[in-house]
Swiss-Prot record:
Zinc fingers typed C2H2-type, residue spans: 173-195, 201-223, 229-251, 257-279, 285-307, 313-335, 341-363, 369-391, 397-419, 425-447, 453-475, 481-503
GO CC annotation terms, alphabetical: nucleus
SMART domains xref list: KRAB, ZnF_C2H2
Gene (UniProt): ZNF626
The protein's name: Zinc finger protein 626
Record's keyword terms, sorted: DNA-binding, Metal-binding, Nucleus, Repeat, Transcription, Transcription regulation, Zinc, Zinc-finger
SUPFAM superfamilies: beta-beta-alpha zinc fingers (SSF57667), KRAB domain (Kruppel-associated box) (SSF109640)
Family the UniProt entry places it in: Belongs to the krueppel C2H2-type zinc-finger protein family.
Function, as annotated: May be involved in transcriptional regulation.
Molecular function via GO: DNA-binding transcription factor activity, RNA polymerase II-specific; RNA polymerase II cis-regulatory region sequence-specific DNA binding; zinc ion binding
UniProt KW DNA-binding keyword: yes
Localization terms from the record: Nucleus
GO terms under biological process: regulation of DNA-templated transcription
């Protein structure tokens, strides 16, 4: 067995594995590597300090070093077993190592690097060994130096320019299927798994499989519930350091990622990437079940759950299950009173930043989402999506209990509670329960007397936005709800419903009167 060397106790990561490590794990790696090196020195084992150790001591990130800096001090071997030296690139685009295998016939031990060798001609001993080594490595570009009894070899791999591409911005590796380009071939290989469906990393807890090992690592925290990253501003904790970094921008308002196409700015690079697809018409991700196509693989994954009906995300508080993790996260806030997002205009606080953004439009009057069919504008994109169904008349959501169909899944969910009698939303003030959170929100205003929906025309204020919308029709004279029986029009659907009921009852009474037999002679005759 040969002398112990630093590489025997070193821990190595691939580029993909390194990116999966969070800050705490990278710090642990740094401490372990430095400790291992210190132990070798303490034991009196002669080793030259690797550049990796110098890098870690200076607090630099290993992956920011140039490739040639990452190679440990060139390994040295006796020429007797130099012919059995082969390169192996096990750490793609980050580290490279040379596997040195001891030749059985070699008698040299404790090899030391003798500096000062400039060329092969200076080496007087073991010329034969050098020639053998040179012959063995004809296929690999190399620089070979021989000094006395020892040979120094530095391998230069063909893809050593990978680091340079990071600075030039070039993306030479393109995937034909979707047209996406990458700087590194290894990243392209990883990306291909999205299209092929290859998911080699499986969770032992729930059986879910992933394309990348780092995705599996992140997923496991769902089962453990571990949240080591805490926000100093609001105390909220997160599973991943990157999520905490993005979250902090909610407090600062920072949006560093800007779209070159439309100028819109975002808090995270992932949100920008998702947004940029809006500007393209490409939809390379297709559902095999129904043929629907999507511009993001994540959207396809989310869509597939519609067909399976799977609800893997369960609330520990009330046992309610959800299809998506983000829906569970949103739901959990029902059980807490946490409202970290506050409106500077009126002081109202919200559980979600998106709700605050939408709320602000009440003050600004902004309605950025416009219907191409009728020109009507909305504050929320979801309201526009909901509105569009009015034009199509489609009702794809059907109740299995009574067969009633609905335009929106949310309406079906609300309707189902009629059959179950479920009323999960309870008023803390009076104890009254409701089957919809929105009704509870509206109900609470009875206790607070709050009326922040104000008519710009006459100044009248309302507790609900729907009441304000109805009221505005008085000023416009709009009467969109028309009775098919008599042609009379109304400004509220509820008034039309009441009107139709009156006509129905009147018609029923007339039918009864016509069908009723006349009294008189027949009755008298019967009496006689």
């Amino acid at each position: 067995m040969g002398p112990l060397q630093f590489r025997d106790v070193a821990i190595e990561f691939s580029l993909e594995e390194w990116h999966c490590l969070d800050t705490a794990q990278r710090n642990l790696y740094r401490n372990v590597m430095l400790e291992n090196y210190s132990n070798l020195v303490f034991l009196g084992i002669t080793v030259s300090k690797p550049d990796l150790i110098t890098c870690l001591e200076q607090g630099r990130k290993p992956l920011t070093m140039k490739r040639n800096e990452m190679i440990a001090k060139p390994s040295v071997m006796c020429s007797h077993f130099a012919q059995d030296l082969w390169p192996e690139q096990s750490m793609k685009d980050s580290f490279q190592k040379v596997v040195l295998r001891r030749y059985e016939k070699c008698e040299h031990d404790n090899l030391q690097l003798k500096k000062g060798c400039i060329s092969v001609d200076e080496c007087k001993v073991h010329k034969e060994g050098y020639n053998e080594l040179n012959q063995c490595l004809t296929t690999t570009p190399r620089k070979i130096c021989q000094c006395d009894k020892y040979v120094k070899v530095l391998h230069q791999f063909p893809n050593s320019n990978g680091q340079k591409r990071g600075h030039t911005g070039k993306k030479p590796f393109k995937y034909i299927e979707c047209g996406k380009a990458f700087k590194q071939f290894s990243t392209l290989t990883t990306h291909k798994k999205i299209h092929t469906g290859g998911k080699p990393y499986k969770c032992e807890e729930c059986g879910k499989a992933f394309n990348h090992s780092c995705s599996l690592t992140r997923h496991k925290k769902i089962h453990t519930g571990e949240k080591p990253y805490k926000c100093e501003e609001c105390g909220k904790a997160f599973k991943h350091s990157s999520t905490l970094t993005t979250h902090k921008r909610n407090h600062t308002g920072e949006k560093p990622y800007k779209c070159d196409k439309c100028g819109k700015a975002f808090m995270s690079s992932s949100t920008l990437s998702k947004h940029e697809i809006i500007h393209t018409e490409k939809k390379p991700y297709k559902c095999e079940e129904c043929g629907k196509a999507f511009n993001r693989s994540s959207t396809l994954t989310t869509h597939k759950i519609i067909h399976t009906g799977e609800k893997p995300y369960k609330c520990e508080e009330c046992d309610k299950a959800f299809k998506y993790s983000y829906t569970l996260t949103t739901h959990k806030r029902i059980h807490t009173e946490d409202k970290p997002y506050k409106c500077e205009e009126c002081g109202k606080a919200f559980k979600y930043s998106s709700t605050l953004t939408t709320h602000k439009r009440i003050h600004t009057g902004e309605k950025p989402y416009k219907c191409e069919e009728c020109g009507k504008a909305f504050k929320r994109s979801s309201d526009l999506t909901t509105h569009k169904i009015i034009h199509t008349g489609e009702k794809p959501y059907k109740c299995e209990e009574c067969g009633k169909a609905f335009k929106y899944s949310s309406n079906l969910t609300t309707h189902k509670k009629i059959h179950t009698g479920e009323r999960p939303y309870k008023c803390e003030e009076c104890g009254k329960a409701f089957n919809q959170s929105s009704i509870l929100t509206t109900h609470r205003r009875i206790h607070t007397g709050e009326k922040f929906y104000k008519c710009e025309e006459c100044g009248k204020a309302f507790k609900c936005s729907s009441n304000l919308t109805t009221h505005k029709k008085i000023h416009t004279g709009e009467r969109p709800y028309k009775c098919e029986e008599c042609g009379k029009a109304f400004n509220q659907s509820s008034i039309l419903t009441t009107h139709e009921r009156i006509i129905l009852e009147r018609n029923s009474t007339n039918v009864k009167n016509v069908a009723k037999p006349s009294s008189g002679p027949h009755t008298l005759l019967h009496i006689r």
